[in-house]
UniProtKB/Swiss-Prot annotation:
Designated name of the protein: 5'-nucleotidase SurE
Localization per Swiss-Prot or TrEMBL: Cytoplasm
Bound cofactor: record note: Binds 1 divalent metal cation per subunit.
Family recorded in the similarity comment: Belongs to the SurE nucleotidase family.
Organism: Bradyrhizobium sp. (strain BTAi1 / ATCC BAA-1182)
NCBIfam families recorded: PRK00346.1-4 (NF001490), surE (TIGR00087)
Signal peptide, first to last residue: none
Gene from which the chain derives: surE
Pfam assignment, any one: SurE
GO cellular component, one term: cytoplasm
Enzyme class: hydrolase
Keyword list, A-Z: Cytoplasm, Hydrolase, Metal-binding, Nucleotide-binding
């Protein structure tokens, strides 16, 4: 089985080594194509106005000066040649990708691009606490990642579905189990704009997260609730975003 791995944290991110280790537990035909620089939050952006620069950093390890989407396209359509990958793994992201994160996440986008190419694709993310932000533990991802991917692959992944896996911020022996979840939703206002001043007194801004606003009680059955209860969250996400429930009503409204 040929596996293509990517991420959005960049070619030198610790989580990329973790995704490679997970991949090597499944196959010895593993290829790494990841962004040259950190691309967190770029979502499914595609580089159309700038050339892509490709650098081989080691055997079957390549850095692309572009987005995670660019990396998957470069890997599948150029680097791997005539033999497409059988599986795309994106991650392991430093930080969870749940609720509204899936819209912004480059990790999710890397897996989605694999799905667009008709390949079974997984996004894997490791939650961390404030105390472990600088050095999150990857042991939980290493323990549960291979078995989740293997079991889902054996059962088969629908063509337009990407599997979003999030590991809780705890040691492997503290994980209560695996649970299939739906995408959650945070309180409004979890994003904030932080205004600061530079040395000349000019304003500049950071987009950040208001942790206090996000500390609501998550709905049962969601990815947020699973992580809060120390479960590994496995969420199937569809590429087709059509609102089928509203489609019929919209047809009536528009006559």
């Amino acid at each position: 089985m040929r596996i293509l791995c990517t991420n959005d944290d960049g070619i030198h991110a610790p989580g990329l080594k973790v995704i490679e280790e997970i991949a090597r537990a499944l196959s010895d035909d593993v290829w790494i194509v990841a962004p040259e620089l950190d691309q967190s939050g770029v979502s499914h952006s595609l580089s159309l106005n700038d050339p892509l620069r490709l650098r081989e950093v080691g055997p079957r390890h390549f850095a692309v000066r572009g987005t995670p989407t660019d990396c998957v396209i470069m890997g599948a359509r150029h680097i791997l040649g005539a033999k497409l990958p059988d599986l795309v793994l994106s991650g392991v992201n430093k930080g969870r990708n749940v609720a509204e994160d899936v819209v912004y996440s480059g990790t999710i986008a890397g897996a989605l691009e694999g799905t667009i190419l008709g390949l079974p694709s997984f996004a894997l993310s490791q939650e961390f606490s404030i105390a472990t932000r600088d050095k999150p533990s990857w042991d939980t991802a290493l323990k549960f990642g291979p078995q989740i991917v293997r079991k889902v692959l054996e059962a088969g992944v629908p063509r337009n579905t990407v599997i979003n896996v999030n590991f809780p911020a705890c040691a492997p022996d503290e994980v209560k189990g695996l649970v299939v979840t739906r995408q959650g939703k945070r309180n409004l206002g979890f994003l904030k704009v932080d205004e600061r001043r530079d040395g000349r007194g000019n304003p500049y801004f950071w987009i950040g997260f208001d942790r206090a606003a996000a500390l609501d009680v998550p709905d049962e059955g969601t990815d947020l609730a699973a992580l809060a209860a120390r479960y590994v969250s496995v969420t199937p996400l569809r590429l087709d975003r059509t609102d089928e429930a509203f489609s019929g009503k919209l047809t009536t409204i528009l006559g």
